[in-house]
Amino acid sequence: MRVRLLTLLARLRAANERVGHVMNDVAGWLFVVCALFVSFDVLARKFLSVSSKATVEITGYMLAFGLAWGLCDALTTRAHIRVDVLVSKLPLRFRVWAHGLALAFLAVLGFFFAWRAWAVVLESWEFSARDSSALTIPLVVPQSLWALGITAFFVLTVLMLTEVSILLSLGRRGQVDRMLGPRTLREEADEALEAAGLPHGAS
């Protein structure tokens, strides 16, 4: 029963990871567009004495939900900043429980953020709130995108935490350590080679 449930959770997590990867790509392109928009506005002010008058608001929205949309991919690829000097020196049987505890705290934090994010969206919806720029964008639009990214992150933490709990009950400590532990130097080198378009193992 636990093995079948573990298989189902792994599939759900993989689906969430694929969605998170797409969201991360969208977030990356948003930052590019944001940089281009700011650059254009600066140059237009300098040489044409004109401004979009909405740069701050639009780029603020892009940065906010772009960051939220990158959370899932950062977690699954273990790209987030980690301070685990002590944890990495623990024996495996203790290390995996430390990883699980950290993930549990992350899930609680994700729930709180998702809960408060949708509360903000609901409040903006009830008051038909709009921004103060010339575009008067309904705040519920960018806020919903922002809350969606946080919610996807929370769902991923719950799926991972459930999967890790079952793995620990089955005694699969190595699998938990590979899932939640820091990336190895080999993994980081392979990622750098892949980004450079070089075959893995090339010097």
PLM feature segments, named:
Residues 1-203:
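Alpha-helical transmembrane segments and membrane-interface helix-loop junctions
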